[in-house]
Regions:
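Glycine-/charge-enriched secondary-structure boundary and capping motifs
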Residues: 1-8, 59-62, 74, 79-205
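Glycine-/acidic-rich phosphate or pyrophosphate-binding loops and their flanking alpha/beta elements
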Residues: 17-29, 48-53, 72-80, 115, ...
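Glycine-rich anion-binding loops of enzyme active sites
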Residues: 1-44, 165-168
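C-terminal transmembrane module of polytopic alpha-helical membrane proteins
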Residues: 65-72
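Glycine- and other small-residue-rich loops at beta-strand/loop junctions that grip anionic moieties
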Residues: 25, 66, 90
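Short glycine-/acidic-enriched loop or helix-start segments at secondary-structure transitions
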Residues: 44-45, 146
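Gly-rich Lys/Arg/Thr-decorated short loops/hinges at beta-loop-alpha junctions or inter-strand turns
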Residues: 6, 46-64
Length: 205
């Protein structure tokens, strides 16, 4: 097997208060879902899981990492968690945005209504990968306080980070729209079945 073009770095850290740690799964219906990180124009399919598993190609240039933006992104998220504004959090990595959203739904059993308005090609929007991207959910009762906190970073965020509300937690479906067109509409139970039994089904072939 050739060496993959995407490096893998493992890191550990210290959580000062474990009671404030958040998991990846959505918490409750109507919580708002946000994304922070690289602009969509910086997202690429190069060296992505999509190219490898769907098209059988291990090729392309992986996205470049901006360490200053990564630091800022992590600072905002970690502080927002400590202040208890964020109730769930998940990185957008291999598989892109669609897989990250699916994993949050599978872990919680809750769905999501996602609305994005961008001219990016659909496969790139759903499966493109890039550094410094995190999806998270906020209790709507904490939104005002969180926006005030976020305002402290306005000058740093401008032109550096993409931060945008993309939807809300719903009942039992993951539904993704782009420019009002539905590009994904799946039951969470279907996603969970494929996720949990995919390896077994593959061996049966």
């Amino acid at each position: 097997t050739p060496i993959q073009p995407t490096p893998v770095i493992g890191m550990v850290g210290i959580i000062n208060d474990c009671d404030k740690a958040v998991s990846s799964g959505w918490k409750k219906i109507n919580d708002e879902i946000w994304i922070i990180g690289s602009y969509l124009s910086e997202i690429t399919l190069g060296a992505s899981s999509y190219l490898e598993y769907i098209h059988g190609q291990v090729t392309g240039r992986p996205p470049e990492i901006n360490l200053e933006n990564e630091k800022l992104c992590q600072e905002i998220i970690r502080n927002s968690i400590n202040k208890e504004y964020i109730v769930s959090c998940h990185d957008v990595s291999d598989g892109g945005l669609s897989l990250a959203l699916a994993e949050c739904s599978i872990l919680s059993g809750l769905g999501a209504q996602i609305n994005i308005d961008d001219n990016l090609r659909e496969d790139k929007l759903l499966f493109g990968e890039g550094g410094s991207r995190i999806i998270f959910s906020i209790d709507i009762n904490q939104k005002e306080g969180w926006l005030k906190y976020l305002n402290e970073f306005n000058k740093k965020i401008k032109d550096n980070l993409y931060i945008y509300k993309i939807g809300s937690v719903s009942n039992n479906k993951l539904k993704i729209k782009n420019l009002k067109k539905v590009i994904c509409d799946l039951k969470v139970s279907t996603l969970a079945d494929k996720f949990n039994n995919g390896i077994i089904e593959n061996f049966k072939k």
